[in-house]
């Protein structure tokens, strides 16, 4: 991490976006973990926008994460990581939030820069906190049946809020005549991989918590004349492709950027190029340890 921070600080970027996971997936979800993340973010010289990942709330129910109440951890995350309307970093920038500081949906943010609209959304891994059955509820978990019922209710409410926030981002991009829109969240929401013809991975039950949102993205992208960059983490290796169809036609104006993850501690530079019809130039930056 120190080498990563040093590399970013040496660059001439204007701001950065951190797409979730401030701890590993098998350590306790202690209060100290969030404090350490704040310290890390505030070592960055320029503004950094943070969106939550599954490691810091969705998966905290796991026994190897300390067996926490995930909804309590989500509430604590909102209060701790989003105490004001500004970004993180030594130098901050103002952000619009879907909720008030420290409250529900404050983690969903919005800002514009250089003719591009940016929106971050709380869409974490582990099927977006959607629990499919009793076996999944209790597997290596401290959860009760009541906890899982509450988690599914939380998923439904947040899924609706995320879809609304995404729709508002598209509406704003159209109103501004923006050349591009960037949507950032942590989860790999599941796409149909072209390497496995005859199998549509996106329809697997473990991705069911993302279907409503992705269907909405497809619908909005079809009606948007600019370029859409969909950025996520979770899968831990770098990838750029065009994975969405509507329903069988490739969406030419949507590009997926999957970012690096542990143990590959690198970052990705995205540049807006006015004369580039694709708008976004994507460059992986390898950090030498």
Protein language model features and the residues they cover:
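N-terminal active-site segment of His-dependent metallophosphoesterases
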Residues: 1-33
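His/acidic metal-ligating clusters that form di-metal
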Residues: 6-15, 119, 135-243
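Residue-level signal for helical boundary/lining positions with a hydrophobic bias
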Residues: 17, 49, 111, 230-232
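Active-site environment of divalent metal-dependent phosphoester hydrolases
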Residues: 24-26, 52-61, 126-131, 189-192, ...
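Short, flexible/disordered intra-domain loops and linkers
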Residues: 28-31, 61-69, 193-208
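Charged helix-capping and loop-helix junction motifs
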Residues: 31-37, 210-213
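Extended active-site neighborhood of metal-dependent phosphoesterases/phosphodiesterases
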Residues: 33-161, 165, 245-271
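A short C-terminal boundary segment appended to hydrolase-like catalytic domains
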Residues: 273-289
């Amino acid at each position: 991490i120190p080498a990563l921070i040093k590399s970013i600080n040496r660059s001439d970027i204007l701001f950065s976006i951190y797409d979730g996971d401030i701890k590993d997936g098998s350590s306790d979800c202690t209060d100290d973990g969030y404090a350490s993340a704040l310290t890390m973010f505030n070592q960055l010289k320029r503004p950094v926008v943070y969106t939550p990942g599954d490691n810091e709330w969705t998966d905290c129910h796991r026994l190897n994460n300390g067996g926490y109440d995930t909804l309590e951890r989500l509430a604590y995350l909102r209060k701790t990581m989003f105490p004001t309307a500004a970004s993180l970093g030594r130098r901050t920038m103002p952000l619009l939030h879907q909720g008030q500081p420290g409250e529900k949906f404050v983690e969903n943010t919005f800002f514009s820069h250089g003719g591009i609209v940016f929106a971050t959304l709380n869409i974490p891994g582990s099927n977006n906190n959607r629990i499919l059955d009793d076996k999944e509820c209790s597997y290596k978990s401290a959860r009760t049946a009541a906890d899982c019922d509450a988690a599914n209710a939380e998923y439904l409410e947040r899924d609706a809020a995320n879809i609304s926030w995404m729709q508002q981002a598209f509406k704003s991009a159209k109103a501004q005549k923006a050349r591009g829109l960037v949507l950032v969240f942590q989860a790999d929401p599941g796409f149909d991989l072209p390497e496995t013809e005859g199998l549509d991975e996106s329809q697997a039950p473990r991705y069911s918590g993302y279907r409503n949102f992705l269907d909405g993205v497809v619908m909005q992208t079809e009606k948007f004349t600019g370029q859409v960059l969909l950025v996520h983490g979770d899968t831990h290796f770098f990838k750029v492709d065009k994975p969405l169809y509507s329903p069988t036609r490739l969406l030419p104006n949507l590009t997926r950027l999957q970012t690096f993850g542990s143990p590959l501690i690198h970052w990705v530079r995205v540049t807006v190029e006015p004369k580039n019809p694709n708008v976004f130039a994507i460059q992986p930056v390898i950090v030498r340890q």
